């Protein structure tokens, strides 16, 4: 499998051939259709995030098709088109059950805690909790923005600001 790999902080990533990932128990392997490039990726390979270990395949914004199912996965089928949030909760703890996976003590983050989506394939853990089906009519370049940027904005507007259906919001600026 071809992948972009960061071997050393601050150096240019390189394209390498790596072994294909295996589906972990409760997880899946995705064939990556498209992946995003985010400011967080820059911080990871610049060495600004002390949780990132090297070598690492970056990438946390993705859309792809389920290529393999791990033991116990029930919510998706092989071939299904999906995306995933940047912060992937365990799906079992009280935070995940309350919809707050971003504070899950056992969260994972593709491209940070394990190899990410700048590859032909990526392993996703806790698939039944983290995968979101994506319609065939949605363009991949739009879908890759959903897992990080959209999810961040959506939670800020709904959970923090209390915005409800029918209300109006003005977006003054955006960036990363």
Please give the residue ranges for each predicted region.
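Short, conserved catalytic or interaction motifs in soluble domains
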Residues: 8, 71, 98
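NAD(P)H dinucleotide-binding glycine-rich loop of Rossmann-like/cofactor-binding domains
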Residues: 90-172
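Short N-terminal binding/cap micro-motifs at the start of the first secondary-structure element
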Residues: 10-15, 39-40
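Conserved glycine-rich cofactor-binding loop
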Residues: 175
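Cytochrome P450 core scaffold surrounding the K-helix E-X-X-R motif
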Residues: 40-46
């Amino acid at each position: 499998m071809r992948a972009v790999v960061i071997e050393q902080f601050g150096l240019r990533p390189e394209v390498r051939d790596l072994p294909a990932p295996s589906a972990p128990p409760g997880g899946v392997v995705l064939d990556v259709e498209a992946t995003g490039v985010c400011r967080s990726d820059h911080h990871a390979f610049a060495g600004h995030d002390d949780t990132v270990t090297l070598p690492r395949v970056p990438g946390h914004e993705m859309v792809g098709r389920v290529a393999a199912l791990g033991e116990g996965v029930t919510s998706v089928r092989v071939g299904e088109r999906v995306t995933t949030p940047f912060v992937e909760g365990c799906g079992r703890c009280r935070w995940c059950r309350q919809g707050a996976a971003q504070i899950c003590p056992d969260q994972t983050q593709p491209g940070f805690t394990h190899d990410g989506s700048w590859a032909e394939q990526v392993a996703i853990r806790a698939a039944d909790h983290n995968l979101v089906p994506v319609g065939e009519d949605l363009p991949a370049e739009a879908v890759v923005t959903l897992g990080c940027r959209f999810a961040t904005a959506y939670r800020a507007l709904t959970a923090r600001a209390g915005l409800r259906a029918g209300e109006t919001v003005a977006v003054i600026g955006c960036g990363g």
